């Protein structure tokens, strides 16, 4: 089965024709924290660009920061005093936290740092800078000249939606008052570069389109941008792709006003966190950021989550027990890619998903420390990072001859596993080694089995986990001890719970002499 990004790349080549360079675009208004749902737009554009690059084409990925949009409302986490900045460009509203040059920069800066960790070739542009240096001046003037055409297009869709037509004094743009920087009403245009405006503070004045104070309204700005940059592909959320929405009107405006065709698009669904109710909102503050994911996920896994889901399927990221399954799945796909494991009829698609989840094709499989087991090891207080690596080698989870690249990856996973246990792991996964035996009285038959395991461990300084596992089963089987009762007793003995991690691996990771003493109920 063809990966969806490859399908889209082929469609772009077919419909847009062979080009020296294809342009893909994504865009976000930095009105609040840019969360993992917003990131889906950028990643969808990126991965289609990735597929085009893999076919030998040059690709320019523009991510447009719509930071010349107006500040519409004061978010819950911002002081109410910021009401005085309503109507100003978000790029000119002060940063409430005082650490960046503006409100918009606070959110843009963080997101750009987060994206850099994914090694994605993206060119971040700021709409405020492009408007202010007059880059869009010609296109803005064209929109003024085509005011009648634009109104006719918009009114056609408004009629279908049973909305009243636009008023005769409507203009395809608005002005930021040069003095107060508030959104102002346009009241006249001189037919060339001059635009007359009325400021909400009460005064009137003229401004030149080329001075950067005139900004196109969203339904005109979007198609203008497609034309200006020659955009071939831009994904969009379903609100922008519904019938009569900004994509529909944009297709007609770019053709009628700018003489070009709209880019191809893909609708992407929401991204949420499993167990979280409602839609994430950067201005409401109920969000998960990429930096939150980086606390528990390798960058490759973050990319993998988005690459494996078709854009029209909602993503629910499970930061609980499901995260262990995600690591297992990613490691399996990685082994399939390197031919170490066979797929189940889906081999080629899985390999391609993996390729699109990494910035460049890796030359070898870097050591995979099983995250599920690391979540156990990081809870053993006597183990240092070096001890954990030694345990992984000893139990055969990673090779003996580790390169620095291997060690770096293992250390990263250790850190991520520790974070996961502290922040997201359910109680059933957490445990503490008891300072005294969790059981004081044991059935004589079970006690006998415990002593036999203790004797075996005492006489085997070096052993394989499989050998210990076999002994654990054998001593119980020959005494007709039910497995559930036997294992439950051992878990209670060490961690005071009925259940726990894989027992043989767990016991093998503990100090051997301590395990022997505990099995003998000596401490």
Curated annotation (Swiss-Prot):
Keywords: Aminoacyl-tRNA synthetase, ATP-binding, Cytoplasm, Ligase, Metal-binding, Nucleotide-binding, Protein biosynthesis, Zinc. Zn(2+) 2 binds at residues 177, 180, 199, 203. GO terms for cellular component: cytoplasm. SUPFAM superfamilies: An anticodon-binding domain of class I aminoacyl-tRNA synthetases, Nucleotidylyl transferase. It is found in: Cytoplasm. It comes from the Archaea. This is Lysine--tRNA ligase. It comes from Pyrococcus furiosus (strain ATCC 43587 / DSM 3638 / JCM 8422 / Vc1). The lineage of its organism: Archaea, Methanobacteriati, Methanobacteriota, Thermococci, Thermococcales. The gene is lysS.
């Amino acid at each position: 089965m063809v990966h969806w990004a490859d399908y889209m790349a082929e469609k772009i080549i077919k419909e847009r024709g062979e080009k020296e360079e294809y342009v893909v675009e994504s865009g976000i208004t930095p009105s609040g924290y840019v969360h993992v749902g917003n990131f889906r737009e950028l990643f969808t554009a990126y991965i289609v660009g990735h597929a085009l690059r893999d076919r030998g084409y040059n690709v320019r990925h523009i991510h447009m920061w719509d930071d010349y949009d107006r500040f519409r409302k004061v978010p819950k986490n911002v002081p109410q005093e910021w009401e005085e900045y309503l109507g100003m460009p978000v790029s000119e509203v002060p940063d409430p936290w005082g650490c960046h040059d503006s409100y918009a920069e606070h959110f843009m800066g963080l997101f750009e740092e987060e994206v850099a960790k994914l090694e994605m070739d993206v060119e971040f542009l700021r709409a405020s800078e492009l408007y202010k240096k007059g880059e869009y001046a010609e296109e803005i003037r064209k929109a003024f000249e085509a005011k009648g055409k634009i109104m006719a297009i918009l009114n056609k869709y408004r009629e279908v939606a049973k909305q009243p037509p636009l008023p005769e004094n409507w203009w395809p743009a608005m002005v930021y008052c040069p003095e107060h920087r508030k959104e102002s009403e346009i009241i006249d245009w001189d037919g060339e570069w001059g635009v007359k405006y009325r400021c909400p503070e009460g005064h009137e004045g003229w401004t030149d389109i080329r001075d950067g104070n005139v900004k196109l309204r969203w339904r005109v700005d979007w198609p203008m941008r497609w034309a200006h940059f020659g955009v071939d592909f831009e994904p969009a959320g379903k609100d922008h792709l519904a019938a009569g929405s900004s994509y529909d009107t944009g297709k007609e405006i770019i053709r009628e006003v700018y003489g070009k065709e709209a880019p191809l698009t893909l609708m992407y669904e929401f991204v949420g966190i499993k167990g979280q109710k409602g839609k994430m909102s950067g201005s409401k503050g109920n969000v998960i950021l990429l930096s939150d994911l980086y606390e528990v996920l390798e960058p490759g896994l973050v990319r993998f989550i988005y690459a494996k889901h078709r854009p029209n399927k909602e993503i629910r990221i499970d930061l609980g027990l499901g995260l262990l399954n995600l690591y297992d799945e990613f490691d399996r796909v990685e082994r399939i890619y390197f031919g170490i494991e066979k797929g189940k009829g889906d081999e080629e698609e899985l390999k391609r998903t993996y390729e699109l989840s990494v910035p460049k094709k890796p030359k070898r499989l870097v050591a995979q420390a099983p995250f599920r087991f690391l979540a156990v090891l990081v809870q053993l207080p006597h183990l240092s990072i070096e001890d954990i690596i030694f345990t992984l080698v000893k139990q055969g989870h990673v090779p003996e001859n580790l390169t620095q690249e291997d060690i770096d990856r293992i250390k990263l996973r250790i850190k991520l596993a520790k974070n996961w246990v502290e922040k997201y792991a359910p109680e059933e996964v957490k445990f503490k080694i008891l300072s005294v035996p969790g059981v004081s009285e044991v059935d004589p038959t079970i006690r006998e089995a415990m002593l036999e395991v203790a004797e075996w461990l005492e006489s085997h300084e070096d052993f394989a986990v499989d050998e210990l596992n076999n002994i654990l089963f054998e001593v119980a089987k020959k005494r007709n001890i039910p497995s559930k009762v036997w294992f439950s007793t051992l878990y209670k003995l060490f961690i005071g719970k009925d259940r726990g991690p894989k027992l043989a691996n767990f016991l093998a990771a503990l100090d051997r002499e301590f395990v022997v003493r505990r099995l003998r109920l000596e401490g």
